[in-house]
Regions:
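Intracellular loop-helix junctions on the cytosolic face of multi-pass helical membrane proteins
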Residues: 1-12, 141-142, 169-316, 320-327, ...
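Short amphipathic helix-loop junctions that connect adjacent transmembrane helices
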Residues: 33-49, 313-335
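Central cavity-lining transmembrane alpha-helices of secondary-active solute carriers
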Residues: 55-71, 340-353
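Glycine-rich segments within core transmembrane alpha-helices of 12-TM secondary carriers
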Residues: 61, 148-165, 190, 443-454
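Conserved MFS/SLC helix-loop-helix module at the cytosolic interface between two early adjacent transmembrane helices
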Residues: 67-87
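C-terminal ends and interior cores of transmembrane alpha-helices
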Residues: 87-107, 378-396
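A membrane-interface helix-boundary motif in multi-pass transporters
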Residues: 172-189, 255-261, 368-371, 460-482, ...
Length: 661
């Protein structure tokens, strides 16, 4: 038995890649579990904007493997790409930690966060396709152990994904926005561990069955002068043609269809990159046929991941706001912890599914890859059927049992086991060796598009309240009853937290978004009589710091804010001091928040927010999404239709695989 083999017949290199990927996925899923919560609870973005950023980030995370795969196949090799990618991702997580330190100054925190996301996106592009490709390279071509190897590798991914939300959520998702940074730091440590393990052991274990190193700089074949001239003419012409297609499609998607910049680029790449590969004249008939199978199934996989990846966006909002997370009256489970349900079930169920496929294979009844993936899509649709029925007649402010969310994740997990590891194995089996990493990148490209779509669809999540605008207030003045003079309260004092309720406020603000700021001439429209409830005081905001408006508090009785809406405006666990005013028509709330500065504890950061208490419901294809039931039906239709279509195409795709399954 060679140094690189185990008694169970798998190379030891598989378990090194298992551990490396486990810690990298710990880093990714730990940050992802906190990301939308960080955006909405710390940086105070609304759900639509947070969902859009989430979709852009996860979409680009799966787009850049296309570039990373190309660089590895042509220039760097797998090993160098993995190391470079890991270093960039560690830097990205460190920047996320830094962003969390400055969350009380949203402009600085957002800028640092965007740099962190950029590093994570580029780093993932080099890391992800290359480590998956190396798993297949550990085995001889046609080895029957490859499917089992990818199942084991997939368990490593999900073991990291299980631990991450629990560990990062325990220190980051505490209800206090100041703690998000510790979750990001934990994710950074996970990435550093992944790098240390891979770099220290790669030379010993990442080898072929005959002991040759895997993943080095690719050998350059030196062609004859005639071959080089012919190749350059065809290759360069083809590259320029598809680059032109990429640019043209981008312009169409951006200028005509109206997609955003990132969405337009992802959609354009989804057409141009596969087109570049399939038009390679060196491909023979069988190779081209098998590549078409990858493309067709990848198209249907978009529907799967667009529905499945709601876990990090709309289903996180659902866990936070609509799920009773109290466990036996002892404590509330963090919303981020629910993202551990899927990976732990993967770890538990993956061996059972592997045994099922083996048993069916012995009876000559094992479904081919396209059929398995059709089943996976069907299971996702079933999961949404269950949760949709549960929320159909849900009253305002009523929360559902966490059992139903667990049920959805359990069914989705079974669907994932029918689709995702089978897809990775299928790409390795069907891809020509010279295009192995690049086609793995194309496979992830479908996931990129799916994640972008997932973020956009999450933006249709119906909200009870919607934050219209937010402003930073460097200081405000309060005129108290019984005082002859105006007391000026600067943002570096704790006066507000310890003194009596003001009867008159003058608030000087700076607008983060000038387009959303109230017009100077329209200040009167905010001057409504307010309820005398002790919680509610009235105040207003000016567009610029030199515009000051004073409004006396009135005591006439007007509608109060419903409790379930109030909880969304003033989240439990925040150290912020709140004063809230509601307009006479009960459609708008004005919130003044004072939060201790994270760096200088003696300083108070002041923010002013305007909330729509009865926001307009979103609509998709002209159909208004009035409630959660209608929102979840969207995913039932998306996954269900894709499942049926792929089912009927399965036999045709099997023939196109030319003997492979």
């Amino acid at each position: 038995m060679s140094e690189a083999s185990t008694q169970k017949g798998h190379p030891k290199g598989l378990y090194l890649l298992f551990t490396t990927e486990m810690w990298e996925r710990f880093s990714y899923y730990g940050m992802r579990a906190l990301f939308t919560l960080y955006l909405t609870k710390a940086l105070l973005f609304d759900k639509a904007l947070a969902s859009a950023i989430y979709g852009d980030y996860t979409g680009l995370v799966y787009l850049t493997p296309l570039i990373g795969g190309f660089v590895a196949d042509r220039y760097w090799g797998n090993r160098k790409s993995i190391i470079v990618g890991g270093v960039l991702m560690a830097i990205g997580q460190l920047l996320m930690f830094t962003s969390g330190m400055f969350y009380t100054t949203p402009s600085s925190a957002t800028a640092i966060m965007l740099l962190g996301l950029l590093a994570l996106i580029v780093g993932n592009g080099f890391f992800k396709p290359n480590i998956s490709t190396m798993v297949g390279q550990l085995y001889p071509q046609g080895d029957k152990r490859i499917d089992a190897a990818f199942t084991i590798f997939y368990m490593g991914i999900n073991l990291g994904a299980f631990i991450a939300p629990l560990a990062c959520g325990a220190v980051g998702d505490t209800g206090d926005p100041a703690d998000f940074k510790w979750g990001f730091l934990a994710a950074c440590i996970g990435m550093i561990l992944s790098l240390i393990i891979f770099i220290s052991m790669k030379n010993k274990y990442i080898v072929t069955p005959d002991g040759s190193p895997i993943g080095g700089v690719p050998e350059k074949v030196v062609p004859t002068i005639e071959e080089k001239a012919a190749s350059d003419k065809v290759g360069n012409g083809r590259a320029y043609m598809w680059l032109g297609v990429l640019v043209t499609l981008y312009v169409i998607f951006k200028g005509v269809v109206g997609f955003d910049i990132i969405g337009s680029f992802i959609f354009a790449c989804t057409v141009a990159a596969p087109g570049y590969i399939i038009t390679d004249p060196s491909l023979d008939k069988i190779e081209r046929s098998r590549i078409w199978v990858i493309y067709i199934i990848a198209f249907f996989v978009i529907a799967f991941w667009a529905a499945f990846e709601q876990a990090g966006a709309s289903l996180t909002f659902f866990a936070e706001e609509q799920t009773d997370r109290n466990l036996f009256g002892w404590f509330d489970i963090p919303a981020s912890a629910f993202q551990s349900v899927n990976p732990i079930l993967i770890v538990a169920l993956a061996p059972l599914f592997a045994m099922l496929w083996v048993r069916l294979g012995k009876k000559n009844q094992e479904p081919a890859s396209p059929m398995k993936q059709s089943i996976g899509l069907f299971m996702v649709a079933v999961g949404y059927v269950i949760i949709a029925l549960v929320v159909k007649d849900l009253g305002p402010g009523v929360k559902v049992s966490m059992v139903w969310l667990f049920s959805l994740y359990a069914i989705h997990t079974m669907g994932e086991l029918c689709l995702s590891p089978i897809g990775l194995s299928m790409v390795v089996k069907l891809a020509p060796v010279r295009y192995s990493s690049l086609l793995m990148g194309v496979w992830f490209l479908s996931t990129a598009l799916a994640n972008k779509v997932a973020g956009d669809l999450s933006g249709y999540y119906p909200e009870d309240v919607h934050k219209k605008s937010a402003y930073g207030a460097p200081k405000f003045e309060a005129n108290f009853n019984g005082l002859d003079s105006t007391v000026v309260i600067d943002a570096n004092t704790k006066f507000f937290a310890s003194n009596a309720k003001p009867s008159m406020w003058t608030v000087a603000t700076t607008a983060d978004n000038k387009k959303e700021a109230p017009e100077k001439t329209g200040m009167d429209k905010f001057m409504h009589n307010m309820t005398a409830d002790p919680l509610v005081d009235y105040f207003t905001a000016a567009e610029e710091t030199d515009v000051v408006t004073s409004v006396a508090i009135q005591t006439s009785v007007t509608p109060k804010i419903e409790e379930h809406k109030l909880k969304q405006i003033t989240p439990k666990g925040e150290k912020t001091k709140f004063s809230i005013g509601v307009s006479e028509d009960a459609n708008t709330a004005y919130v003044l928040k004072m939060t201790p500065d994270e760096i200088n504890k003696e300083k108070m950061n002041v923010a002013f927010e305007v909330w729509d208490l009865n926001p307009k419901k979103p609509s998709i294809f002209g159909q208004e999404i009035k409630n959660l039931y209608e929102f979840f039906v969207v995913f039932i239709i998306l996954a269900g239709v894709a499942s049926v279509l792929l089912f009927f195409l399965s036999k045709t795709l099997l023939k196109m695989m030319h003997g492979l399954r």
